[in-house]
Amino acid sequence: MRISGHEFARMCDATLTGAVATHQEMLEMIKQAKKYHFYSVIGQRCYLDEMVEKLKGTDVLVGAGCSNITGADPAEVKANFAKWHLAHGAQEIENIMNISAFKSGLDDMVVRDVRAVRDAIGPNVVYKCILEVCYLNDDEIRHACELLIEGGVDYVKTSTGKAGPATLHHVEVMSEACKGRAKIKAAGGIRSIETVERMLDLGVERFGVG
């Protein structure tokens, strides 16, 4: 599937959440998001109010993550963070699957975790949840997609990009598992327009860049 630069930008969530990401880098991300019309930005929680203010009146949304990098926060903590973000102007929410619970076979805990955030934000807020596919084999990816769909997500997302890259194979497995019941966001290690176009053919609707 061939797309223009503008079409690709409107599928991109620009992300800047690293531990050493600076305030100046956040301002530059916002500048680039406005210039290229990215779909959304996700930054450090301490700058959320400022990001919301600077993007008022633009076509760029502000997203927010409600989990630490491991996904192992208690469900109530994630739910409260999600509500806090919405109260401060965030328009989309991202969670990270509880990878420890998943690897432990605690499927009910995984679903409760995902569902707690959905219940906290309501049915109309776009909600994404990250698998961290680099930690999972194909069967685990398929099973994780089922649990996240059961928990009420709009998007299953490959990765944070901090643990390892997302590959075409990962996306193919996710696409086969989701069967259109959830949308797919790809992030981490996507370096060429050819890869983007092949991922689009597999059903990816949003990309993380940062």
How should these model regions be labeled?
Residues 64-69, 87-102, 150-167, 186-210:
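Glycine-rich phosphate-binding active-site loops on the catalytic face of alpha/beta enzymes
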Residues 8-16, 41-43, 60-67, 93-95, ...:
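Hydrophobic faces of well-ordered beta-strands that scaffold small-molecule active sites
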Residues 3-4, 21, 109, 121, ...:
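A generic short alpha-helical patch detector that favors 3-5-residue windows
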Residues 52, 73-84, 136-147, 169-186, ...:
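Catalytic cores of alpha/beta
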Residues 1-64, 68-87, 142-143, 147-150:
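Conserved N-terminal beta1-alpha1 strand-loop-helix module at the mouth
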Residues 45-70, 105-128, 132-133, 150-151, ...:
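Alpha-helix-loop-beta-strand connector modules within alpha/beta enzyme cores
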